[in-house]
């Protein structure tokens, strides 16, 4: 792995922490959750929301968005320098849903960004509490990953839509810091780098001058983040090549796409954390729970326990299935969009279906949708078992996979074999081993060829009963191998649009 000296747990990244012991980490993550919860309670008071309205996930998303927008300094600066008609750069807002005379009504609210920043800081003991902001960004990113398949974005950068399991975090904003970088998939990093290289090809001055120096260091930093996700020497050596290139161009794009493809079998390390909507933290804090005192972890039992005891509601469109909406949000809560569905079904205790079989659209409601026919229902976010989240890709092996998604990116550290469609993946690697990286390419292909179906990942790791807080009795799950393993199977999920 990365040199042990520089590695920090993602709880440390999450809290910008220096080296801390487990108790300190749990306390600082708890403090972050407390801050989000207190902010949410205050916003519900400002907006005069009832308890039910405050537990509506659509209201939660609007409130989270408002605070993220209030702290988006780069965009705020841009809006002030490029005033556009009908947009007040100093204000932020969105739709808030209220129950009036037995009907759901949409109300557009507008607040001064300065006021929102004041409320946020007050809830966070006067700090900017960047970690809490990033936490909400990751929750939005996980929800996007579960709701949309990034087919168009993949095709535009010359990648294959079947590589969607590599795209975790593809909608995270650039300002999401170290915690954001930790949860980005290999494909996401590759896509960001390819976009950068393409700009350099089209714009002569992109790498030049004072700005070019900044661009270059950003490029090298992104290469290093991607390199740190790879687990084999050959993949890392390839990233060194890409990073050191004097004038990045098509050869580097080729190498990047090659390395992304290879990650379908030789998976990278991608962190997973359960980031819940603010409307879960708010009521918990309101009930008197002290997250900082009790301690909290994003990768252990805590989010599962919290969801066992939370009531969250969602607006439901006329032909949507509330159970399907619940599955969508449950997967997002556990950062499990690219996990094997058979394992998810086991942990959740109810069948988890591929995206294309779900009768549900995204959680957000567009401004032109008719509110008269909107109902609301409870989201079922409880689970049968819990499992430890992983930041490793697991070791590699093969099994029948699907026409849509041809690999998985594990979210839980649980013993199983990881499905991928070897013949489909290997077909992309015919004879393309020329050029500077030929020896690395040959080595990577050799390792991929050698990946065996029998190999088990996360050996000895199991799921745990919810009563087993100390994780003492692992239950190693058994799977029905006849079921489909991929979520975006031959898929028709909507496309993500900014």
From Swiss-Prot:
Pfam families, A to Z: Flu_NP
Residue numbers spanned by region Disordered: 1-21
GO cellular component: helical viral capsid; host cell; host cell nucleus; ribonucleoprotein complex; viral nucleocapsid
GO process terms (BP): symbiont entry into host cell; viral penetration into host nucleus
Similarity section: Belongs to the influenza viruses nucleoprotein family.
Source domain of life: Viruses
Keyword Ribonucleoprotein among record annotations: yes
Post-translational modification: Late in virus-infected cells, may be cleaved from a 56-kDa protein to a 53-kDa protein by a cellular caspase. This cleavage might be a marker for the onset of apoptosis in infected cells or have a specific function in virus host interaction.
Molecular function via GO: RNA binding; structural molecule activity
Function statement: Encapsidates the negative strand viral RNA, protecting it from nucleases. The encapsidated genomic RNA is termed the ribonucleoprotein (RNP) and serves as template for transcription and replication. The RNP needs to be localized in the host nucleus to start an infectious cycle, but is too large to diffuse through the nuclear pore complex. NP comprises at least 2 nuclear localization signals that are responsible for the active RNP import into the nucleus through cellular importin alpha/beta pathway.
Keyword ATP-binding: no
Broad class of the protein's primary localization: virion
Keywords: Capsid protein, Helical capsid protein, Host nucleus, Host-virus interaction, Ribonucleoprotein, RNA-binding, Viral nucleoprotein, Viral penetration into host nucleus, Virion, Virus entry into host cell
Protein name per UniProt: Nucleoprotein
Subcellular locations according to the entry: Virion; Host nucleus
Organism: Influenza A virus (strain A/Memphis/110/1976 H3N2)
Gene from which the chain derives: NP
Biased composition (Basic and acidic residues): 8-21
Positions occupied by motif Bipartite nuclear localization signal: 198-216
Subunit structure: Homomultimerizes to form the nucleocapsid. May bind host exportin-1/XPO1. Binds to viral genomic RNA. Protein-RNA contacts are mediated by a combination of electrostatic interactions between positively charged residues and the phosphate backbone and planar interactions between aromatic side chains and bases.
HAMAP family: INFV_NCAP (MF_04070)
Motif extent (Unconventional nuclear localization signal): 1-18
InterPro entries on file: Flu_NP
